[in-house]
Amino acid sequence: FRIYVFDTKNIPDLLTKFLRVRKEFIGPNQPRNLLPMSKELEMATTICSNSFKTFKAGSYYLPENSNDFQLCWVSGMINTYPMLALNNEKERNRVSAELDFVVNKLQGKSGYFYGGITANGELRPEKMYPDFPALQAMVRKNSDALLWLIKHFMLLKAQGYSSMIKPEWENAAKKLAAAFSKTWHQHGEFGQYIVPETGEIAVFNSTAGAIAPAGLAIAADYFKHPEWLQVAKDAANYYYKKDVVMQGLTGGHSGDISMDADADSGLGFLESLMALYYYTNDKTWLQKAEVQAALCASWTLSYDAVFPASSQIGKLQSKMAGAVWASIQNKHAAPGICTASGDYLFKLYRATGNQLYADLIRDIQHAHAEAVNIPPHHITTNNLVGSSMERIQPSDAEGEESVGNYINTRNSWTETNGMLMSLELPGIYVQTDKGQFYTFDHILVSLLNKKQKSVVLRLTNATAYDATVSIFAETSAEAKNPIPVAAFVHWPTVNIPSGETVKVQVNNRGKIKLLK
């Protein structure tokens, strides 16, 4: 082992130091190119498409291994986003039906949403405080809901289907943003649990509202309501000082762990800080985001753990650097972020040029791919083809027999974050004027030629699957400008059959051309 001794002024300095040295002892990890992101998207969207059902309550993609519906957090009305991104009429109409269902069945009088509903149409309570009998909902779920509702609207606009955005959906998003604003002005925080009927806070404290500033910032821009942006800034400053600067941890984001420290809230708060940078162009948010990214890295495996040779992960020789520890209670890691692509880490890399942020989200994506069930040669969940589940267990916290072994089940949220990473992260990011690139997808890339206005890249697909790889190219000057929410819609792609190599010219306008 190695001990680092250094002077530090505060917790943010400690966190940023940790980010710089977290891989120094063992050196860089070696992620495997196993599963192209396009293949993962294909398999996971097939699972999700087959899960669309109609019940007495309404029509929706199942977010759990039951027929009941749970809003956001573990994928409800988040798994709709990659299905909408497929840009076909069948899934577009299904997504529309689910948004109708959510807006009509789950929104309370206050503007906040209830956390779930049974297939038979009965509202589902959260894990409630017994001395507070009113039906409550997680603030975290409502924070997700505001962000993802408007992301759906922006994706429809980017696809050319703005006419499909219903006034009822927009009104629901407005009411939710207004509810958050009202709560903030009344209490100076968002709390952890709220009462959708009245808007009353049932349980105070925690960082359960970590994603709320992102939702409010995007809502302020979409609806041209600047007051919500001010609330977003005030709330983000509050949480940053209270939880990041003063404690070096965030919590309260998961429904099963009370207010324990967790990764979800930390990563969700990074989403908010990057959203505020996007909508204000104020670099103080970027500075806060760098500290927050360092905190997020502390929840992520920095090395390829050695698993028992007889375990499932050991037999597969999986490289698990990038697995994300969910919380201090769960005592295991998971494939990916609950529930997001983590594209804010890519955006932070793009804005700062610090490759450590790109390495972090690349590790997360590649560890996720290792957990995907791909029979007959890469079996993890013993479940559906393309499925994954939430346990990557490098410790004996659940018993020695659990180390390196999966559980025979699947989780929609892990499959959903895999879909989101496949969409919202570019396969290759290129700065043409510098001749620099970074590869997120599971291919090998080398620079063959650099000219003033273009580069030529060699792309090799050594995996067992054909790959469709997105390329996001720009100049270093353009990288100073934030990119829109649904930017991936406009990224060109190149097809690379399994085992083959192609050459592609990428110009400074982001256009690509296959070369012989």
What annotation goes with each model-predicted range?
Residues F1-A179, A473-T475, P482-K516:
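Carbohydrate-recognition beta-sandwich/jelly-roll modules
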Residues V5, G76-R92, D144-I165, I211-P226, ...:
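Well-ordered alpha-helical scaffold segments within catalytic/enzyme domains
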Residues K9-N50, Q159, A275, Y279, ...:
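Terminal, non-catalytic domain-edge segments
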Residues R22-N29, N33-P63, N93-Y114, P167-F190, ...:
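Long, well-ordered core segments of solenoidal/helical folds
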Residues S49-L71, F113-V139, H187-I211, G248-S272, ...:
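Carbohydrate-binding/catalytic loop surfaces
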Residues S75, R94, A137, K141-D144, ...:
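Soluble or luminal CAZymes and related metallo-dependent hydrolases
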Residues E126-P133, M154-P226, Y240-K241, Y278, ...:
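Active-site lining segments of carbohydrate-active enzymes
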Residues A202-P213, A217-D221, P226-A235, Y239-G251, ...:
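A domain-scale signal for long, ordered structural cores in large, multidomain proteins
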